[in-house]
UniProtKB/Swiss-Prot annotation:
Post-translational modification: Specific enzymatic cleavages in vivo yield mature proteins. Envelope glycoproteins are synthesized as an inactive precursor that is N-glycosylated and processed likely by host cell furin or by a furin-like protease in the Golgi to yield the mature SU and TM proteins. The cleavage site between SU and TM requires the minimal sequence [KR]-X-[KR]-R.
Cytoplasmic side: 854-983
GO-annotated biological processes: symbiont entry into host cell; virion attachment to host cell
Lineage, opening ranks: Viruses, Riboviria, Pararnavirae, Artverviricota, Revtraviricetes
Residue ranges crossing the lipid bilayer per the database entry: 833-853
Comp. bias intervals (Basic and acidic residues): 1-20
Species name: Maedi visna virus (strain KV1772) (MVV)
Protein name: Envelope glycoprotein gp160
Chain positions covered by the region annotation Fusion peptide: 657-677
């Protein structure tokens, strides 16, 4: 151990205590330093060199000397006044705008009002749908890995309408095509399942029956659902329109879909989750499939005129050119050739994007005969085309692993033992449980067709493309001015394929049928001079022409080797007509092998394409917590609203100025109070930030104290372990000495020499503990830890004291307002707010009372006009015969003595009550429940009329009057006993 003089002086316990009572001067000095540092920070913030918020560094790795509170101290008065004024003016402007929108009345609809108030960015369009998580919902969730029905809301009950304006703003009248990965995942699962169980199927018998049949046959139906924050927009109304018309060829580069009505839902409609290739689908899918028969928009299109385009415009869903049916990430599902008929690329595969627009719709089989298209019997024998359309799959189709007839009534099926899943064929070793041989009439069928020239906006009629040797010069058969975009400017007088030089300079091939009908126009920008130079360069065509010869219906050129030029496979010009060389609308100078302008096929789609088509009705969006929308109200509610509107229109009040004044006064008070509270909140927030930062600094200091204490405890534990090791060493030495004594051995050069066996000596532990740490070094380190801990405790105590002081400086809202403003001069009128509110409430009550009185007076005036009408009929009685001559003696024929005194009888109270009650029952006031309280006025009206008739009022008192009654036609009057009768 070291001597007493070499030991460092120990820190007393008194010195280790934090100096809380003796450091008030230090606190004041700290406040002065902090104020100066805050001013420097504020200057740095203005110049952009400092952060506006001080970060908390618990470990002290950065900026130990900068322990700052937030730089935002209480705002100065002029700044607070400017902020208050701006907030006040802004609120008044906003309230004025809102009142202006409300006063517009019927100029806007409910969707527009909601779009005005709600967040216009309530949902975002999701373009990469493959990143959206999705799950299936079905009843058989335990077997197919789906969630149970009820996990998501029913889309038929829970929805929100999206206004048309918002749809146009987000989608720009373009409802795009999406290649959804959800059907591809379903097909991949089926494909993987078939591969894994291929060996197991070979051992099964034909009687084996499993639930997998339901999945393969498409009986497992469910929905696709997306979780929050995603949702689906389900289109309810849509139409198509052409876009980007090519001015050279006239074809539409794009066909866009405009959705005008949509709903936000969580799940799709029910559909088959998985199925193999089939032709006839379930009747539950008919409505969904029929919805994809999209009609043309109500714009000026040539195809809408059935006189020019028989059948009108085409209906269906247009899969755009360039669409990728199976993406590159899942290319193993493509197969060698496309199994979907017209849905294919230019090589008949699915490796490349689509080269031609493909239309898909629910087939209309009303005109079909025995499974063949209309006019199928009129085709050339062996041909697969009729009326300009080439048909695929007529006669035999593939349905649920069977070869089925295209005639749905026959339903003849032959099971092939193979199932097509995508582009792969899998064997099916046992008899399926589904019934294929049945009458499939009424089941929906997909119809896939392509317009190779892509002129659907001009006509829906398909044509047989002309060969080049059948294209001749018109020579007067074509008149007028037409183009590829204006087919109606020309007239033809003879059937044929006429080469025509348009006024724009390009060449046109006008296809005329039935001597007057133009069925198509193909064009190019190449003029006649350029074409004729190419024609003259052809071998042996110097003396030839393109004039029409022959007596055929379409005509032909004189020399077949000198027809309209085109480029061959070597991209060289040639005029030789070939057997399979046709002209196409989009390839005027190329060699085209397709004879017909349209291609069609029925069926041929599996569940993947079936789901893919049905899902095009939906668009994936990303929504917020509260997405705006209009919830459809019941019909009774709409009728009630209509009646209320009519009643309000009938009972419009003229004087509404006082209501507007009240509303403006309330808004002004709210704006002033809001602006004041906003400034108070800013001031209070400044103090709060300062206090919170002080508390954070104090917490950081206490954290450092804890870390130092932990280091000191570790050092003490180390010393204890050293002491324990040394004690253990001494104990080992003592044990060894005892063993030596028992073994009766002695040491010689650190070895024990004994006569006992060497195995006993191996039992003894000869390990020695070596440590260079002395007690003096350990005590010095303990002294250093104590000193450091004392300093940290003082610093932590100071920080806690400063934090408590800053926390006490936080004022409340009203004190902050008093500090920011001089309320005694500016807002001394605030003390009259209760009186103002009471006055406003009194005016409102007075207004309500006046409205009630006005309604009562109006009702009284209407009911008062209903009177009990008294009709007095005076009929003279015939004169006795014996007195007749006596009365006629005066020469006046008795009429002078017929002036009598009228006898009147007043109505009783009961009669007046009956008349009033009958008038009430027959009035429209009785049928409306809002006017039922007016029945309380009936007794007052009855009393008033009774007083008027009985003379109690004085001014309308009845007086006895004499009534002169003419005695004209008195002999025709009936004989009565009384002198007159009151009715």
């Amino acid at each position: 151990m070291a001597s007493k003089e070499s030991k460092p002086s120990r820190t007393t316990r008194r010195g280790m205590e934090p100096p809380l009572r003796e450091t008030w001067n230090q606190v004041l000095q700290e406040l002065v330093k902090r104020q100066q540092q805050e001013e420097e920070e504020q200057q740095g913030l203005v110049s952009g060199k400092k952060k506006s918020w001080v970060s908390i560094d618990l470990l002290g790795t950065e900026g130990k000397d900068i322990k700052k509170v937030n730089i935002w101290e209480p705002c100065e008065k002029w700044f607070a006044q400017v902020v208050w004024g701006v907030l006040w003016v802004l609120q008044i402007v906003l309230w004025g705008c809102l009142m202006w929108e409300v006063r517009k009345g019927n100029q806007c609809q409910a969707e527009e009002v909601i779009a005005l108030v709600s967040d216009p960015g309530g949902f975002q369009r999701v373009q990469h749908v493959e990143t959206v998580p999705v799950t299936c919902v079905t009843k058989n969730f335990t077997q197919w890995g789906c969630q149970p029905e009820g996990a998501y809301p029913d889309p038929e009950l829970e929805y929100r309408n999206i206004s048309r304006e918002i749809l146009e703003e987000v989608y720009k009248q373009d409802w795009p095509w999406n290649t959804y990965h959800w059907p591809l995942w379903q097909m991949e699962n089926m494909r993987q399942w078939m591969k894994e169980n291929e060996k197991e199927y070979k051992e099964r018998t034909n009687k084996t029956k499993e639930d997998i049949d339901d999945l393969v046959a498409g009986r497992i139906r469910g929905r696709f659902c997306v979780p929050y924050p995603y949702a689906l927009l389900r289109c309810e109304e849509w139409c198509w329109y052409p876009e980007s018309i090519n001015q050279e060829t006239g074809h539409a580069e794009k066909i866009k879909i405009n959705c005008t009505k949509a709903k936000a839902v969580s799940c799709t409609e029910k559909m088959s989750l998985a199925a193999v290739q089939r032709v006839y689908w379930e009747k539950e899918d008919e409505e969904s499939m029929k919805f994809l028969n999209i009609k043309a928009c109500n714009i000026s299109l040539r195809c809408q005129d059935e006189g020019k385009s028989p059948g009108g415009c085409v209906q269906g869903y247009p899969i755009p050119k360039g669409a990728e049916i199976i993406p590159e990430a899942m290319k193993y599902l493509r197969g060698k050739k496309s199994r979907y008929g017209g849905i294919k690329d230019k090589n008949g595969e699915l490796k490349l994007p689509l080269s031609v627009r493909v239309w898909v719709r629910m087939a209309n089989l009303s005109g079909w005969v025995n499974g063949t298209p209309p006019y199928w019997s009129a085709r050339i024998n062996g041909s697969t085309g009729i009326n300009g359309t080439r048909w695929y799959g007529i006669g035999t189709l593939h349905h649920l692993g069977c070869n089925i007839s295209s005639n749905p009534e026959r339903g003849i099926c032959n099971f092939t033992g193979e199932l097509w899943i995508g582009g792969d064929k899998f064997p099916y070793y046992y008899t399926p449980s589904w019934n294929c041989s049945q009458n499939w009439t009424g089941h929906p069928v997909w119809h896939v067709f392509r317009y190779l020239d892509m002129t659907e906006h001009m006509t829906s009629r398909c044509i047989q493309r002309p060969k080049r040797h059948n294209i001749t010069v018109g020579n007067g058969t074509i008149t007028g001015n037409c183009s590829v975009t204006n087919w109606d400017g020309c007239n033809c007088t003879r059937s044929g394929n006429h080469l025509y030089n348009s006024t724009s300079g390009g060449l046109l091939v006008i296809i005329c049928r039935q001597n007057s009908t133009i069925t198509g126009i193909m064009g190019t920008n190449t003029n006649w001079t350029t074409m004729w130079n190419i024609y003259q360069n052809c071998s042996r065509c110097n003396n030839s022409s393109l004039d029409r010869t022959g007596s055929g219906t379409l005509g032909t050129v004189n020399n077949l080797k000198c027809s309209l030029p085109h480029r061959n496979e070597s991209n060289k010009w040639t005029c030789k007509s070939q057997r399979d060389s046709y002209i196409a609308g989009r390839d005027f100078w190329g060699k085209v092998k397709a004879k017909y302008s349209c291609e069609s096929n029925l069926g041929g789609l599996d569940s993947m394409m079936h789901q893919q088509m049905l899902l095009q009705r939906y668009q994936v969006i990303r929504v917020r917590a509260y997405t705006y929308g209009v919830v459809e109200m019941p019909q009774s509610y709409m009728e009630a609203q209509g009646e209320n509107k009519r009643s309000r229109r009938n009972l419009q009040r003229k004087k509404r100025g006082i209501g507007l004044v009240i509303v403006l006064a309330i808004m002004a008070i709210i704006a002033a109070a809001g602006a004041g509270l906003g400034v108070a909140n800013a001031v209070q927030q400044s103090y709060t930030r300062t206090a919170v930062q002080s508390l954070a600094n104090a917490t950081a200091a206490q954290q450092e104290v804890l870390e130092a204490s932990y280091a000191m405890v570790q050092h003490i534990a180390k010393g204890i372990r050293i002491l324990e090791a040394r004690v253990a060493r001494v104990e080992a030495l003592v044990d060894r000495m005892m063993v030596y004594q028992e073994l009766d051995c002695w040491h010689y050069q650190h070895y024990c020499v004994t006569s006992t066996r060497s195995e006993v000596a191996n039992y003894v532990n000869w390990t020695r503990f070596k440590d260079n740490c002395t007690w003096q070094q350990w005590e010095e380190e303990i002294e250093q830890h104590e000193g450091n801990l004392s300093l940290l405790l003082r610093e932590a105590a100071l920080q806690v004291h400063i934090a408590q002081r800053d926390a006490r400086r936080i004022p409340d809202a009203w004190k902050a307002i008093q500090e920011a403003f001089n309320w005694s001069s500016w807002f001394s009128w605030l003390k009259y707010i209760p009186w103002i509110i009471m006055g406003i409430v009194g005016l409102m009550c007075f207004r309500i009372l006046m409205c009630v009185i006005s309604m009562c007076l109006q009702a009284y005036k209407q009911v008062k006009q209903i009177r009990y009408t008294q009709v007095t009929v005076v009929i003279e009685a015939p004169v006795e015969l014996e007195e007749k001559q006596k009365r006629n003696g005066d020469g006046t024929n008795g009429c002078a003595s017929l002036e009598r005194e009228r006898r009147t009888s007043h109505r009783s109270f009961i009669q007046i009550w009956r008349a009033t009650w009958w008038a009430w029952k027959t009035s429209p006031w009785r049928h409306n429940w809002r006017t039922m309280p007016y029945i309380t006025l009936l007794p007052i009206l009855v009393i008033w009329q009774w007083m008027e008739e009985n003379g109690w009022n004085g001014e309308n008192q009845h007086k006895k009057k004499k009534e002169r009654v003419d005695c004209q036609d008195r002999e025709q009057m009936p004989t009565l006993e009384n002198d007159y009768v009151e009715l």
